[in-house]
Amino acid sequence: SLAQLDHGSAARAGLVMSRAARAIERAVGAERVYCLSFCEVDRQLHFHLFPRSRRLLEAYEAATATTGEPVNGPLLFEWARTTFTGGRALPDGFPSVADTCLRIRRALAATAAVGQGDDVP
């Protein structure tokens, strides 16, 4: 559990998540990066960093007839998790998973190169 981390580990976890969220935002143009931690299936503490781009929001709103309503992040996450699971293709125009991973790696490397990741293990 997050509550069981000592202060140093909690601080490092926050820095790692901040750096990762920044890289995800840059790599995929996310307007938000949702941070989720359930630890239900795998009881070990871990986090899901889920990018919410404008295009993903529009796809969600079109599929759920919620255009113009306040965004419900947990419902959007669940919709995406169940819609794009099991190898189902992303909508046209979305980058591939491999391309997205490459972009995130490059963004992480760029932040480390300019000293924004020096304090993160």
List the predicted regions and their residue ranges.
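HIT superfamily nucleotide-processing domains
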Residues: 1-121
